[in-house]
Amino acid sequence: MSAPIVQLAHAAFSVNRCPSCVSWSRTGILACATCHSIALYDPQKNVVISTLNGHTGRVNCVHWVQKNDCSAETELVSGGSDKKVIIWAIEKNKCEQPVAAEGHTEVVNAVHAVYTQRSENELLIVSAASDCTVRLWLRRNVKTECLQTLSFGKGFVLDVCISFLPGSLVPVLACGADDSRIHLYVLQNEQFEKTQVLHGHEDWIRGVEWAVTGQNLFLASCAQDCLIRIWKIFRKTAKENSKTEDENSIKLKENIFKVKEKDTETSYAVTLETVLTGHENSIYAVHWQPSFSRDGSIVQPMSLLSASMDKTMILWEPDEESGVWLEQVRVGEVGGNTLGFLGCQFSPDKSMILAHAFHGALHLWSRAPNKQNEWIPMVIISGHFDSVQDMRWDPDGQFVITVSADQTTRLFGPWKKKGQSHVTWHEIARPQIHGYDMQCLAMIGRFQFVSGADEKVLRVFAAPRNFIENFSNISCISVEKLLLNEDTNLPEGATVPALGLSNKAVFHGEILIQSTQEEGKYNSVSEQYSQPNFQPLNLTEPPTEDHLLQNTLWPEVQKLYGHGYEIFAVACNSAKTVIASACKASKREHAAIILWSTTSWKQLQSLSYHNLTVTQMAFSPDDEFLLVVSRDRNWSLWKKQEGIPEQTEPTFTLYASTDKNSCVHSRIIWACDWTPDSKYFVTGSRDKKVIVWGDCSLPSMNEEKSSALIRPCSSLLDTGDSITAVSVSQVLALDGSYIIAVGLDCGIIQLYKWKHSGTVNDWLKCLAMDQSLLSHTLTVKQLCWRSCLGRAGHDDRDNGDWIQLASCGADHCVKIFDVYRKAL
């Protein structure tokens, strides 16, 4: 069987900033809401299995629909900012035709669903939205209809959960609202009627969840008052109803309501079972341990998980002897500029617990072997929580660095677990945690990069020794090989001063002094609460979120001042001696490109030609040319001057360009790149066209003749959508053609082969990555080919058959693709 042209090696993502964005199925698959998609992730294998695309707005809630017999789930329900509720039928981790339920007029923020007791083809769905309504839907086979709309006036329902009354087929609905009350509805005469309002919480109710135990129904609720309340619903017998109470007896208050079912009236009582206190901030989620089947009966363990903005997650269980609910385990994150947890989940067998944080990070703990209440942090996927703006491979193709509007720079690399052949990708470091949205970056060396953000300053970072040692352990590359051409006098790590944005280097001597001071007495109270200090780590596996936040920063070695507005684009030549940078501009004087020396960090030259923002720049592989594209729909080509002595810094002069009379593109040019032989360059524009220009190897005497020589060498390729990214592989196809990847505004990535032939049909389309797993759901921001053959982290013999492509997009996602050369 032949290998597919493209397969996904990695997809990095984070979870959306909503309480109900993660749901864990009995098959061990996590459904995670990420941007406009739902990622199906296997935490055991550390791989994204599938991506469900159907929402056109942010996905705010997901829920695996549990079957009545506790068998594996096959359906998933989600709600989003596009006002839709979607039911997904999942078979073998792939989605059949999704069914959408439309009717809400505002954002859907909570969903839940149960199968009716009559048939699994009937699904009862409840959804809450910002339009102050709760809607109930019935899905029969493939048709979905709205049964009822419950209005809450001007109030909002923040969470919903539906179940069945004990010993009956009557559905009961719990709605947690912003009036600090829980509203209970019961189905009567084909309509849901309000039967009880549960008082007790003193702030917005953030989470509600039912659990059935024998003849009792328990409801767990949590709120911003930092408390958890557990309510009990049970059937009242005729004997209990007629029994008179002793006036001197002490008993919890019972709220009694009656339900008619098939001409039989039954009384039910609601009592407050317990109040759990232990969190110090708002509690956003509660989750019961999943029920399971044993000896033909359903067992519901009395274990409850809660997640709070105090950065902790607590596991609660009742004491076996007294029945008093007690805190069994408390886990959480320490340090870092974070805001706590929004949601929590049990694994199906309770061997693992998971929380997702305000900034989208997933935290996974596994129970230690043979130790009941000891939990160990585990490796889990991580990623950006806002648009990923730019990315680059390191020169040796061992890792990828990305920058995002979430104000972080992240480094992703491959990892092979000990004793396994399977390679997975993980976030290995977070070199920069900034105060401005990141925009662009360029690699200056293997362990040095320059980044630009929504500020006027370029910042240069270099890897510390601790990162290189840990990267060596994780990638199984010797430290000596990694440091072959690097400075040996490296700092150990970096830390951020309390009132600064710059990562300050920490050297070995400072760590020793710091540890000595910590052992001694403090001279003042302020010294006890000083800024977080760097702690060197010896890692053999990818770091957890706590370590990424505090111990993987890279020291800032230089700031480059010169631009008048926010940095928008940066590039570095192949020799790593010259940096080119540009900023946002609406005038010619501000659109000038500044060239910097990487040895002296001084300005070398200012190149002025364009009238509007320069969108991208690229040095030719032989360093002879600098290509610039701009919002003004033109490109300019700058040539390094010949005959300059080696001692002096290089200077560039305008070699060729287009203007308003000669430009071929009719809209903004977003992207450009060079072929590996430096003969041709490629431009991509919002006008949906890709053009190859050249031949740049032809001799020319002056700018006029050069501009005449540099002309379109290809036919105009119409991609059908705005082009936002272009990348040419440094490795040729087997037939000698150039391999060109094109990223579109709609999120699709297209692969083409092109060879200069002078004919109309010179483009050959190899593939359009428009499948749910391969494509992005929003704009492709950057594409970047690995500079060498093979797959990073692999040592198999067929490495030469593969090349790798990295992509990032406005959907917060970073993807690594394995491309099979022989199939192109």
Swiss-Prot record:
Task: Extract the Pfam families matched here.
Answer: WD40
Protein known as: Elongator complex protein 2
- Start and stop residues of the WD repeats: 14-51, 54-98, 103-147, 153-195, 200-241, 278-326, 336-375, 383-422, 433-471, 562-606, 609-648, 664-703, 718-764, 784-824
Mitochondrion found in the keyword field:
no
Keyword check for Nucleus: yes
What does this protein's UniProt record list under function?
Component of the elongator complex which is required for multiple tRNA modifications, including mcm5U (5-methoxycarbonylmethyl uridine), mcm5s2U (5-methoxycarbonylmethyl-2-thiouridine), and ncm5U (5-carbamoylmethyl uridine). The elongator complex catalyzes the formation of carboxymethyluridine in the wobble base at position 34 in tRNAs.
The record's GO CC annotations read: cytoplasm; elongator holoenzyme complex; nucleus; proteasome complex
